[in-house]
Amino acid sequence: MLKRRSNALITLSRTKLFPITTVAYYHRRLLNQQRRAVSTSPKKEIKSLEDLANLDSLDGVDTELIRDLINEHTTKLNIKKELDMLKKFSQEEESGHEIPVKRFIRPLWMFILMGSSVYLLLHFSWWKLEHEERESQLKKEVEILEHQLNELIVQDKTHNTSRGKGSNESTHMKPWYRRWFW
């Protein structure tokens, strides 16, 4: 049996129905009545979640409408997030092709330092070998010159002894400035 009260239909069961069935029936009937009341009432049309936020209460609003508005807004947000993600991926892909210079600065400095160290080491060893070679050449030249000097000294001694005293007097007769140069 159905009884009408202010805005709802109440089912009264004289038969032995389960309480769950009775509540479900009552709930379904109440929802149908609310839908009819919303569609017949001259209220503002609700087109977005902002319109729902401006309402005082959600009593007269269809739950399907609320669900659809929430789903629509969620879909918009998801699409916006996906577009942002795609833009980010495209920017990363473009920047991935460009190799940043920062990536090569440290290895470049390491290469320069190691290269200059190797260069200085090799240059020092080359300079040392060249110096030793030049030193040995100069020693040979000194030995040759010493040998020539010794020979000249010996020749001069033999030559001086052969001249005797006459050559000494002639050297004294030369002017003083000639004795210094010859």
Curated annotation (Swiss-Prot):
Segments forming a coiled coil: 128-158
UniProt keyword Transmembrane helix present: yes
Side of membrane Mitochondrial intermembrane, spans: 128-182
Membrane topology: Single-pass membrane protein
Segments passing through the bilayer: 108-127
Keyword Metal-binding belongs to the record: no
Main localization (coarse): mitochondrion
Protein keywords: Chaperone, Coiled coil, Membrane, Mitochondrion, Mitochondrion inner membrane, Transit peptide, Transmembrane, Transmembrane helix
Subcellular location: Mitochondrion inner membrane
Biological processes annotated in GO: mitochondrial proton-transporting ATP synthase complex assembly
A cellular component term, taken from the record's GO annotations: mitochondrial inner membrane
Effect of a null allele: Increases frequency of mitochondrial genome loss.
Segments on the Mitochondrial matrix face: 46-107
Transit sequence range: 1-45
Assembly and oligomerization: Component of the inner membrane assembly (INA) complex, composed of INA17 and INA22. Interacts with a subset of F(1)F(0)-ATP synthase subunits of the F(1)-domain and the peripheral stalk.
Family: Belongs to the INA17 family.
Primary role: Component of the INA complex (INAC) that promotes the biogenesis of mitochondrial F(1)F(0)-ATP synthase. INAC facilitates the assembly of the peripheral stalk and promotes the assembly of the catalytic F(1)-domain with the membrane-embedded F(0)-domain.
Designated name of the protein: Inner membrane assembly complex subunit 17
Upper classification of the organism: Eukaryota, Fungi, Dikarya, Ascomycota, Saccharomycotina
